[in-house]
């Protein structure tokens, strides 16, 4: 049975043809919210998101605010590892945190290379795949052109930085695209589009004086994705779609700042029905204006039609970090209207022999959910295991119970290391946000921007990492230092612990 998901703005498109069997209409938003949405007004930011009527929103630069923004804007489902908020249920395709070893390219921080997506159940038993990313901003191609670099130099810089970042991400999505699964990727790519910088459009803006084959958007196109805004607005001159920047904040502009379309919604195996640019009032390229505009980026919105794919076995625990004495929500799905259940086991434990608590024999119902207590679950790492009616494991996801004080703990493997040696550190109770990180600071320096080395935690709640010498800006001289657990690519200190470097 065809159905439309939630968004009144989509339902109001009276000119849209009737949906074919199995098709679903979706409204999607991509929004760089500028350091958590607090630089102008977070309430105004939330109002913009509410007004969009989007079913799914990909946020960039949320700085630990994703869950709070979702709650305030009325979005019940949140993916903290991808910074996606949704009106439809979200399920991680693997275990809920990064299991790959080592540091990942920036857009894959907190994610496994073979699972950059999250499943969104847009119809009973049927899903699409979602991704959301933010590519590195420096060196910025339009700035290089402005400052005199040639096109070959710019393409070389793009290839070295952003193409290197998008390559493994696109490669991780390509198998889904090849299977015919609808895949939607939102993001701030920090790169203009090869579809915009053409010979025909050369000179249409003062800052666009050359034609240039921007490689990042070419790579997304090669992976099977369509640029939703340009598909809806092929006239480059009439609708340039400049997403950066309306101001810092609007209406303040920085003289000489390079403006371009760098925020995108890419869609594969989907039909683009329309796209909009939201931003400041009075701009003829903006479809809807708000005063004040709450970000240094404009927002991109796309109306899409998809035919979702049959869902695999799915399991989610919310929240992933559960206070001792609290409760957590478990959501599950088994294909084929199968009876299902969930068993809670210690991390990596056997569901047949190590179950601490369980709920089993559930009647199949779409998005069936139940609450469990942490009674009997000591602080530490746990797994929820999805089972069928025979008790066979079908899926598994990770969560952790944190002590009653709710505070993360950071512990070095040794309180003293020699100059040039790696530093190993463990942590428990991290929030599991995409860009949580651990930094090294000089003891006594209160400036949290002065980190001497850093590495992302992989969005792991309880884990261990080794800060190897290649991660340091300079070799640490003998002296006293501090390790700090920091939140989501920002500077809120969650935990810290001292260590000493000796000769």
Question: Residues of each region from the PLM?
Answer:
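N-terminal, active-site-proximal structural segment of metallo-dependent hydrolase catalytic domains
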Residues: 3-6, 10, 19-72, 127-128, ...
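Surface-exposed cleft-lining segments at the edges of enzyme active sites
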Residues: 103-106, 145-163, 202-205
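N-terminal signal peptide c-region/cleavage motif recognized by signal peptidases
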Residues: 15-17
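Extended, solvent-exposed regions of the mature portions of secreted/cell-surface glycoproteins
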Residues: 312-503
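His/acidic metal-ligating clusters that form di-metal
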Residues: 129, 158-189
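Structured beta-strand-rich core segments of catalytic domains in phosphoester-bond hydrolases
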Residues: 56, 60-144, 276-279
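Active-site-proximal beta-strand elements of phosphoester/diester hydrolases
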Residues: 25-35, 127-156, 297
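Metal-dependent phosphoester-hydrolase catalytic domains
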Residues: 21, 175-182, 191-313
């Amino acid at each position: 049975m065809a159905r439309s998901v939630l968004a009144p703005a989509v339902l109001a498109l009276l000119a849209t043809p009737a949906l074919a069997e199995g098709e679903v209409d979706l409204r999607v938003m991509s929004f760089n919210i500028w350091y958590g949405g607090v630089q102008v007004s977070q309430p105004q930011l939330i109002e913009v998101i509410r007004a969009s009527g989007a079913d799914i929103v990909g946020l960039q630069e949320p700085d630990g605010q994703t869950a709070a923004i979702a709650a305030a804007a009325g979005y019940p489902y949140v993916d903290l590892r991808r910074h996606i908020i949704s009106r439809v249920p979200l399920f991680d395709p693997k275990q809920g945190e990064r299991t790959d070893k080592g540091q990942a390219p920036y857009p894959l921080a907190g994610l496994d290379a073979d699972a950059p997506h999250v499943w969104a159940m847009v119809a009973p038993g049927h899903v699409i795949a979602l991704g959301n990313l933010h590519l590195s901003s420096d060196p910025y191609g339009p700035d290089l052109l402005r400052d005199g670099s040639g096109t070959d130099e710019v393409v070389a810089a793009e290839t070295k930085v952003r193409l290197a970042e998008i390559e493994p991400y696109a490669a991780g999505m390509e198998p889904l695209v090849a299977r015919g699964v609808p895949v939607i990727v939102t993001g701030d790519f920090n790169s203009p589009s090869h579809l915009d910088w053409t010979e025909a459009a050369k000179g249409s803006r003062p800052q666009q004086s050359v034609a240039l084959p921007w490689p990042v958007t070419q790579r997304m196109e090669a992976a099977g994705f369509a640029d939703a805004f340009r598909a809806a607005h092929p006239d480059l001159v009439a609708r340039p779609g400049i997403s950066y920047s309306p101001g810092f904040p609007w209406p303040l502009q920085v003289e000489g700042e390079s403006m371009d379309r760098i925020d995108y919604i890419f869609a594969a195996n989907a039909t683009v029905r329309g796209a909009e640019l939201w931003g400041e009032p009075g701009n003829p390229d903006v479809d809807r204006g708000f005063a004040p505009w709450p970000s240094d980026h404009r927002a991109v919105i796309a109306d899409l039609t998809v035919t979702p794919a049959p869902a695999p076995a799915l399991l989610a625990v919310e929240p992933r970090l559960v206070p001792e004495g609290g409760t957590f929500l478990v959501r599950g799905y088994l294909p084929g209207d199968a009876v299902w259940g969930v068993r809670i086991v210690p991390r990596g434990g056997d569901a047949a022999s190590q179950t601490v608590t369980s709920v089993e024999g559930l009647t199949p119902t779409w998005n069936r959910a139940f609450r469990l207590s942490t009674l009997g679950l000591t602080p530490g790492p746990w797994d929820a295991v999805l089972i069928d009616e025979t008790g066979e494991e079908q899926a598994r996801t990770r969560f952790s119970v944190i002590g009653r004080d709710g505070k993360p703990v950071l512990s070095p493997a040794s309180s003293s290391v020699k100059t040039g040696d790696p530093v190993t550190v463990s942590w428990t109770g991290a929030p599991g946000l995409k860009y949580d990180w651990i930094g090294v600071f000089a003891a006594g320096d209160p400036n949290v921007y002065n980190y001497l080395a850093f590495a992302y935690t992989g969005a792991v709640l309880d884990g261990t990492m080794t800060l190897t010498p290649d991660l340091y800006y300079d070799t640490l001289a003998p002296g006293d230092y501090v390790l700090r657990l920091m939140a989501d690519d920002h500077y809120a200190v969650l935990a810290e612990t001292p260590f000493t470097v000796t000769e």
